[in-house]
A protein has these predicted regions:
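Conserved glycine(s) in the ABC-transporter nucleotide-binding domain "signature"
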Residues: 1-158
């Protein structure tokens, strides 16, 4: 049985955790969207539609879970309405959004849903930031270990 490099094993475990965090975040986002769509079906009309969007993406080992506001421009009568996304920023150094910033783009009926969803996603963002830092640290440690091993081999050959 071949022994696996401990750094590779640690990195694999951390990457698996990032994948699990993304899957959990995606599940929360989808439940949020199901609740929004359900309410919108029961209450037709543009005035009842949500103007807040939630998305979850994974690229490499990074997870992006963010909110953006929606604004509509143009004439309904002329059928030239266009949607513009408005970036909602998190406070520096924070893993969660300020609820008043989100509520500024939300309808009254969706505020409790936003509060619940953001509490769950904030915890995932916090853990993901620590896991990605651990992945980077393991990569650096592996690089140092391999460079130390190669320098020892060179010294032994002399």
């Amino acid at each position: 049985m071949e022994k696996q490099d401990p750094y590779m094993a640690a990195r694999d475990a951390l990457e698996d955790r990032m994948e699990a965090l993304h899957d959990r975040a995606y599940e929360i986002v989808m439940k949020h969207w199901e609740a929004v769509k359900s309410y919108e079906r029961q209450s037709p009309g543009w005035e009842n539609r949500s103007t807040l969007q939630l998305r979850c993406d994974k690229k490499g080992n990074s997870i992006r879970i963010d909110w953006c506001g929606l604004k509509w421009y143009g004439s309904k009568k002329l059928d030239n309405r266009k949607m513009i996304r408005i970036t909602i920023t998190k406070p520096p150094g924070s893993h969660g959004y300020h609820l008043p910033k989100l509520y500024a783009h939300a309808k009254e009926w969706e505020k409790p849903l936003i509060k619940e969803t953001e509490a769950k996603l904030g915890a995932i963002r916090r853990e993901a930031s620590h896991v990605i830092k651990a992945i980077i640290a393991v990569r650096y440690a592996a690089k140092v270990a391999s460079s130390d091993a190669s320098s020892l081999l060179k010294e032994g050959a002399d």
